[in-house]
Regions:
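Membrane-proximal, glycine/serine-rich, low-complexity loop/turn segments characteristic
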Residues: 1-208, 223-254, 289-295, 370-374, ...
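Extracytoplasmic loops and strand-loop junctions of Gram-negative outer membrane beta-barrel proteins
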Residues: 73-74, 100-104, 158-166, 214-222, ...
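Outer-membrane beta-barrel translocator domains and adjoining extracellular loop/strand segments
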Residues: 143-157, 204-215, 219, 234, ...
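Face-selective signature of the C-terminal outer-membrane beta-barrel domain
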Residues: 175-203, 224-367, 374-378, 435-443, ...
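C-terminal low-complexity, acidic/polar tails when present
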Residues: 197, 251-255, 261-265, 272-278, ...
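Outer membrane beta-barrel strand-and-loop segments of large Gram-negative receptors
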Residues: 281-283, 328, 413, 417, ...
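Outer/extracellular conduits and scaffolds centered on Gram-negative outer-membrane beta-barrels
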Residues: 469-486, 499-503, 511-524, 531-553, ...
Length: 637
C-alpha cells in the first residue's frame, strides 16, 4: 500500500518515527522514548527502510520528513525481506544534489533514568553522498518487578508450590552505534553504496533479589547477569539499469558478532555459567528484472552462510559449533489485465545445517500468488497466498542445557527441522481523499513447527525444550478506518478485531480467542501538533503459553520553531503500577502464572529536542532494491 503524507503531517514531524506515528498505520505501535516500531498483533518484527535500505534508529532519527515522497507499507512481505518479518515500511525520500545536512536528536525521560541522543551529518557533491552518524543510549531502572506462582505435579502425583516475587531489582544498559556510508548515484541508472557500521552494548551488574516461598521454606535468592557485545557490519550494494527495460541488482552483507555473558542464580543452590559467543555471516543476493509488455519478469538468487561458535563454561558446560547454509532461487511475473493487477511467483530453497554431530538437508517449494482487482474507483479487493520455510532460532537449536531455577531447565534441540508456513490474506479496501478504510482477514498455517515440550524427570526436574509437532494456526481479522474530520487539520483513526490461536501439539491442544482495539487522534495547529494514542495491548497463545503484552497510551504535544522542534509526551496515563506483561503456562505437569510490572513506564513523561540544518537542492533518490541483515548471536538463555 502506497501512502503519500500530507504537508501537515510532514511539517508536524521531526524524524522518521514521528511521521510514521502521524500516519496511524494499522497494527503498528510507535514508542516515543525507545524509538522503536513494534507489531501489536505479535506476528513478527517490523522492518524499516529508507529508499529500500534496511535502517535502524540512527537513520530514522536523521531522516528529514520534509524530504519524504511516499511510504510503501507492506503487510504481507515475502521471504526476501528476511525471517520473522511481519511488516515492512519503506520510506522513499529525495536526495540533495549538493549541500549538506547536520543535526542532532535528544530524548530524555523526566520521570526515569532513560534517554538517548545522536548527532549526524550528510554531505552531497555531484554524484557522491557521504553520511556519518553516532548515537548513545542507556537506562537505569529499579522499578521493574515480577511475581510468579508455580505449581509442579511431582512423580508421585502430589503438588509442589513455589512463589517467586521480586523485592529488589536493578536493570541497566548502555549502547553506542556509529555508521559511515558512501553513496554514488548516476541519476537512477547506476547506484553504488558502501556502508560500515559498528555497535557496542553493555548491560553490567544487573540483578534481581527474589522472595522465595518453597514449600515450608522461606528465603531470598539472587540472580545476576552481565552482558556485553560488539558487532561490525559491512554492506555493499550495486544497481545498474542495463537498458530502459532491464536492471541488475546485487547486495552483500558481512557481519561479525562477539558476545560475552555471565549468569548467576542461587535459588535452591548456586548455579553460574559464562558464554563466549562468536558469529560470522555472509548474506548475498542478485536480482535481474526485465520490464516487458504487458508484464514484468524478475529472477533472483539468494545465498547465506553463517557460522556460530558458543562456548558455555561453568555449570552449563557445552561447546556448540553451527554451520547454516541456505540457497534460495526464485522467479516472479507481475502485470495488469484490465482492472486486475497480478503477481505470480515461485521459488525453491535448500538448507544445509550442521552442529557438532547433527546435520540435515531441507528442500521447500515456495509459490506466491498476489491478485488485486479494482471493483470501482477507490474500491479494491485483494488476495495473497504464499508458502515458505521457517527456520528455528539458532539459540534453541543449541545442544546446551541451562538451569532456569531450582526445579526447571532449558535444553536446546539440535535436531529441530524447519517448518513450512502457508499464509492467506483477503482484503477489501475503500479509499478517498479524506477516508481510508479496509477489512482484512489473515490466516496462517504452520506445518510441523517447533513447539514447546515439557517433560518431568524421575528426580522431579522439569525440562523445557522444543520439538517439531503437529501444527499451529492463527486467524487474524480486523477493520480499519482513518478519516480527516478537517482536511490537513484534524485526523482520527481506529481499528480493531479478533485474534484466534490454534495449537496442536503431540499431547496437547490449546485454542484461544482475544480481541484488540487501537485509536488515535491528531490535530495540526500551525506550529503546534497534538496527538493522542491508545491500544489494549496484545493477547496470544503459543504452544502451551498464554501471553499478554501491556497496553499503551500516550499524549504528545510538539512545537516547531525554525530548525528546532520540541516535543513533550506523557505515556501510560494515570497508571502508576503499569503491567508490562503476563504469562500463563498451562502444561499438564507444570502450571506457572507470571506478571511483570514496570512502574517506570507508567505515567512516564519524556521530552524530545531535535535540530536540523539543511542546505542544498533535491532530486529523486535512487532506491536500494534488496537488503540483507543479521543480528542473531545464537546464545540460549
Amino acid at each position: 500500500m502506497l501512502i503519500y503524507p500530507t504537508n501537515a503531517q510532514k511539517q508536524g514531524s521531526n524524524n522518521g518515527f514521528s511521521i510514521l506515528e502521524k500516519l496511524s498505520l494499522a497494527n503498528l505501535r510507535i514508542d516515543h522514548v525507545n524509538h522503536a516500531v513494534t507489531a501489536i498483533d505479535n506476528r513478527g518484527e517490523v522492518q524499516l527502510r529508507v529508499n529500500g535500505v534496511v535502517v535502524g534508529k540512527q537513520e530514522m532519527l536523521a531522516l528529514d520528513p520534509k524530504d519524504v515522497v511516499k511510504i510503501d507499507f507492506i503487510n504481507n512481505p515475502g521471504v526476501r525481506y528476511g525471517e520473522g518479518i511481519a511488516y515492512v515500511v519503506d520510506i522513499v525520500t529525495r536526495r540533495s544534489e549538493s549541500g549538506y545536512t547536520v543535526g542532532t536528536d535528544l530524548t530524555a525521560s523526566l520521570t526515569t533514568l532513560q534517554g538517548d541522543g545522536m548527532v549526524y551529518g550528510k554531505w552531497n557533491r555531484g554524484k557522491s553522498e557521504w553520511s556519518l552518524s553516532y548515537g548513545m543510549s542507556g537506562y537505569r531502572s529499579r522499578d521493574g518487578k515480577s511475581m510468579q506462582l508455580a505449581r509442579y505435579t511431582l512423580a508421585d502425583g502430589s503438588l509442589y508450590t513455589i512463589e517467586r516475587n521480586d523485592v529488589e531489582t536493578l536493570r541497566k544498559t548502555m549502547g553506542q552505534d556509529a555508521k559511515l556510508t558512501y553513496n554514488w548515484a548516476d541519476s537512477t541508472a547506476t547506484v553504488f553504496q558502501a556502508s560500515l557500521a559498528g555497535s557496542l552494548s553493555k548491560a553490567p551488574d544487573n540483578y534481581r533479589i527474589k522472595d522465595i516461598m518453597d514449600g515450608t521454606r522461606h528465603y531470598r535468592a539472587t540472580s545476576r547477569d552481565d552482558d556485553k557485545s560488539h558487532s561490525p557490519v559491512l554492506d555493499l550494494y550495486f544497481f545498474r539499469q542495463i537498458s530502459p527495460h532491464q536492471s541488475l541488482t546485487a547486495n552483500a552483507v558481512g557481519t561479525y558478532i562477539s558476545t560475552q555473558t555471565s549468569s548467576f542464580y542461587d535459588e535452591g543452590s548456586p548455579y553460574q555459567y559464562d558464554v563466549d559467543g562468536k558469529t560470522a555471516s555472509l548474506l548475498t543476493e542478485v536480482i535481474y528484472e526485465n520490464r516487458l509488455r504487458p508484464f514484468t519478469v524478475s529472477t533472483g538468487l539468494n545465498y547465506s552462510a553463517k557460522y556460530t561458535k558458543n562456548d558455555y563454561l561453568g555449570d552449563a558446560f557445552s561447546l556448540t559449533r553451527t554451520n547454516n547454509n541456505r540457497l534460495y532461487a526464485f522467479a516472479e511475473m507481475k502485470g495488469m489485465l484490465g482492472q486486475l493487477r497480478y503477481a505470480l511467483g515461485s521459488g525453491a530453497s535448500y538448507i544445509h545445517y550442521t552442529q557438532n554431530d547433527h546435520r540435515y538437508h531441507f528442500w521447500t517449494f515456495r509459490p506466491k500468488v498476489s491478485l488485486a482487482y479494482n471493483i470501482t474507483h477507490g474500491l479494491q479487493l485483494s488476495y495473497t497466498y504464499q508458502q515458505q520455510d521457517r527456520v528455528s532460532r539458532i539459540a534453541i537449536t543449541s545442544d546446551a542445557m541451562v538451569r532456569t531455577n531450582s526445579m526447571e531447565w532449558t535444553v536446546g534441540n539440535p535436531d529441530l527441522k524447519p517448518s513450512r508456513d502457508r499464509e492467506h490474506r483477503l482484503q477489501l479496501s475503500y479509499n478517498t481523499n479524506r477516508l481510508q478504510t479496509f477489512i482484512d482477514a489473515y490466516f496462517k498455517q504452520c506445518i510441523k513447527p517447533n513447539m514447546a515440550h515439557y517433560h518431568r524427570t524421575d528426580d522431579n526436574q522439569f525440562v523445557y525444550t522444543q520439538i517439531n509437532q503437529k501444527e499451529i494456526d492463527a486467524l487474524h481479522m480486523m477493520a480499519y478506518a482513518g478519516y480527516w474530520l478537517v482536511p490537513e487539520k484534524l485526523q482520527v483513526a481506529v481499528n480493531g478485531g479478533l485474534f484466534r490461536c490454534f495449537n496442536y501439539g503431540q499431547d496437547y491442544t490449546h485454542l484461544y480467542t482475544s480481541w484488540f482495539y487501537v485509536g488515535s487522534i491528531t490535530a495540526y495547529l500551525g506550529p503546534f501538533t497534538l496527538q493522542g494514542y491508545i491500544d489494549n495491548g496484545n493477547r496470544f497463545f503459543e504452544g502451551e503459553s498464554k501471553g499478554y503484552n501491556g497496553s499503551y497510551s500516550v499524549l504528545t504535544a510538539s512545537y516547531t520553531w525554525h530548525d528546532w522542534q520540541f516535543s513533550l509526551s506523557w505515556a501510560n496515563l494515570f497508571d502508576s503500577h503499569y503491567k508490562a506483561y503476563e504469562n500463563e503456562l498451562l502444561n499438564r505437569d507444570l502450571y506457572k502464572h507470571t506478571i511483570g510490572y514496570s512502574n517506570g513506564n507508567g505515567n512516564q513523561v519524556s521530552i524530545n529536542i531535535s535540530w536540523r540544518l539543511s542546505r542544498g537542492s533535491k532530486h529523486k533518490s535512487a532506491e536500494k532494491r534488496i537488503n540483507l541483515r543479521d543480528t542473531d548471536n545464537g546464545i540460549i538463555k
